[in-house]
């Protein structure tokens, strides 16, 4: 099957999110800078392609794009484009500092953060409004893809932190917005968790192609922990850092539980999964949790967390390589466009 613009899947943004978070993870653990910089360049190339193609599809095939947004499964996946912009912004802010000109880094992070945040809110509101007003969503269409809009919202505070540090006159406003976005995404995450839990225990599991979406739930847990620590650190208030670190660790622990539980469910309920584009749903959630592990290792000054962060980073890079290689092979053979 050859590439067709009208059939370009709405979840390609997950590849940008995944590559960006791997870049951040390798920087957070302290690996040689050329690794994270190379990954940032790759993430930037992928981001440009995905954004341009997605934009072209919205211009030339608007009705198909709107149909995806209204779909109870694809609608959630549409938010990955916004997530890609925000994860890219976080990667530029983390890795670009000290490498690229300060003005370029701040400007790029600001533009991507604003664009990503606006898209995240618009897509999230549109998706949720459609679900509420449709009132006939089949239970089998409830999936882990519903986690994506909350996940994307929770990335926004991490993109705001470097801006708050570089723009001291606006620091209080930016940090306040960060806490607000964290609350927005966190509450939505817990609501979706309850809905997905009820759906999963009372109905058959989603089809194979959606199995990786069950794994997405660990992502927001890691991101919430990261948000708490980073926002507290950016405030310059040691007392707030001390208060947020245990809460962040609690969320990290829930993310670890979710990771093991979802892998057990996938292993027992599905067996061997065929590769599909949805495999990128494994990369970003695990990457977010891995970065949280590295940050908590530094905050707690914990040798145990440091070892876990190293192991998780190695596994993350291996997962990203496997997913990337399979994606490139699918593009070469044309099979990826069927998903």
Positions of predicted regions on the chain:
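C-terminal transmembrane-bundle signature of multipass membrane proteins
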Residues: 23-24, 47-53, 57, 193-199, ...
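Juxtamembrane helix-loop boundaries in multi-pass membrane proteins
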Residues: 1-25, 62-90, 109, 113, ...
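Membrane helical hairpin/interfacial module
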Residues: 32-104, 112
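Internal transmembrane alpha-helix with an interfacial aromatic "cap," most often the third helix
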Residues: 91-95, 123-136, 158-167, 186-205, ...
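Hydrophobic, membrane-facing alpha-helical anchors
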Residues: 1-4, 55-67, 103-107, 122-135, ...
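Helix-coil boundary and interhelical linker segments in multi-pass alpha-helical membrane proteins
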Residues: 25-35, 93-108, 160-177, 229-242, ...
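First transmembrane helix
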Residues: 15-21, 44-55, 123-126
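Structural signature of hydrophobic alpha-helical transmembrane segments
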Residues: 38-52, 105-121, 176-191, 245-255, ...
């Amino acid at each position: 099957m050859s590439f067709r613009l009208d059939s370009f899947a709405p979840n390609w943004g997950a590849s940008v999110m995944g590559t960006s978070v791997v870049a951040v993870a390798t920087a957070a653990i302290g690996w040689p800078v050329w690794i994270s910089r190379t990954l940032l360049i790759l993430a930037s190339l992928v981001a440009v392609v995905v954004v341009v193609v997605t934009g072209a599809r919205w211009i030339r095939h608007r009705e198909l794009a709107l149909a995806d947004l209204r779909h109870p499964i694809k609608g959630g996946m549409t938010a990955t484009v916004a997530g890609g912009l925000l994860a890219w912004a976080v990667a530029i802010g983390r890795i670009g500092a000290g490498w690229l000109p300060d003005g370029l880094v701040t400007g790029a992070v600001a533009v991507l953060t604003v664009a990503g945040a606006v898209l995240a809110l618009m897509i999230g509101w549109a998706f949720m409004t459609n679900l509420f007003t449709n009132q006939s969503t089949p239970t089998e269409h409830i999936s882990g893809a519903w986690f994506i809009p909350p996940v994307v919202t929770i990335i926004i505070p991490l993109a705001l932190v470097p801006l708050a540090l570089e723009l001291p006159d606006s620091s209080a406003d930016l940090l306040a917005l960060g806490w607000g976005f964290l609350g927005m995404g966190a509450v939505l995450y817990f609501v979706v968790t309850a809905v997905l839990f009820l759906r999963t225990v009372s109905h058959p599991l989603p089809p194979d192609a959606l199995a990786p979406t069950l794994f997405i739930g660990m992502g927001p847990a890691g991101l919430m922990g990261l948000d708490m620590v980073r926002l507290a650190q950016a405030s310059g208030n040691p007392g707030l850092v001390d208060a947020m670190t245990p809460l962040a660790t609690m969320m990290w622990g829930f993310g670890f539980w979710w990771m093991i539980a979802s892998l057990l469910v996938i292993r027992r309920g599905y067996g061997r999964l065929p590769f599909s584009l949805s495999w990128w749903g494994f990369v970003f959630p695990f990457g977010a949790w891995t970065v949280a592990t590295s940050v908590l290792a530094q905050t707690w000054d914990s040798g145990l967390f440091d070892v876990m962060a190293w192991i998780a980073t190695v596994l993350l890079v291996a997962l990203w390589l496997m997913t990337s290689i399979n994606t490139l092979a699918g593009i070469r053979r044309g099979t990826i466009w069927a998903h």
